[in-house]
Amino acid sequence: MKFVCDKSKLNEAISVVSKAVNNSCAIDILKGIKIDADDKLKMTGSDLDLSVESIIDAHVEESGSIIVDARIFSDIVRKLPDGDITIETDDQNEIKISCASTKFNILYLSSDGYPEIKKIDDGDSFKIYSSDLKNIIKSTIFAISNNESRPILTGSKFEINKSTLRVVSIDGYRLALRDQIIPETPYDGLSFVVPGRALNELLKILKDDSTIVTVTVRENSVMFAFDSFVIISRLLELYRYGGESVYYN
C-alpha cells in the first residue's frame, strides 16, 4: 500500500475516527484504526458499539488495507510538518511515514480480522441541517443520566412525527426536551434511543452550517451520514412505531 495525502486532512480524519477506538480493549485489532486505500482513503475506528468512518482525498499509488495503532499513529501525524505525507507499507509489517525530511517507521497489523462495519442502506431515514441537529443535541444532552443501573436513561430519545423531531433526555431529576422542524417524513411515532456517548462524539464533529445530515435507523442501530463522515451506533432501545417508549413513560 502506498499513498500521498495532505497532513491537515489526514490529521482531522484520525482525530475523528479515534473517538470510537477503545485503547483499553482486550482485542488488539480494535485498538487500531483501519486504513483502506483505493480510489480514496477510508479510515475507520470502532469498538463494536460505536463506529466512525471518514473518507478523504489521497493520491493512491498502491491500494491496500491495514490496521495501525490509533494512539501512536495519531501522535506521529500530529507532530509532522504541514504538507503532503507519504505512507507506504513493506513486507516486514512496517509502515513508513514521511513528510519533508521527517520519517517514522511503525508496525501495522493485517486487517483480515477487523469486524465488518455494516452501513444501514435500507432503514427508515430523515434529513436535518447540521446546525439544527447540533443545537438540539446541545440543548438536551446535559440531562442524560450517568447512572449505568438504568442504561436506557444514558441516552436521548429521538421521536419523529411527520415534520417534527423531538429529542428528550432525562436523568431522574432533570428533563430536557426540544422540538425541531425537519423536512416532511412519512413517519408518525417513529422513536429510538441513542447512547449519550455517540451523541457526544457527534456533537464534536457537527458544524454550525446547512450541511445535510441523513439519519437512518434500523432494528438496533442508527447511522448519521454527512460530508465525508459516517457514524454508526447501537441503540439503547429498539426503534418502534407509535405508542410510548416502555422505558421513557
Give names to the regions the model predicted.
Residues 1-249:
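Structural preference for solvent-exposed beta-strand-turn elements
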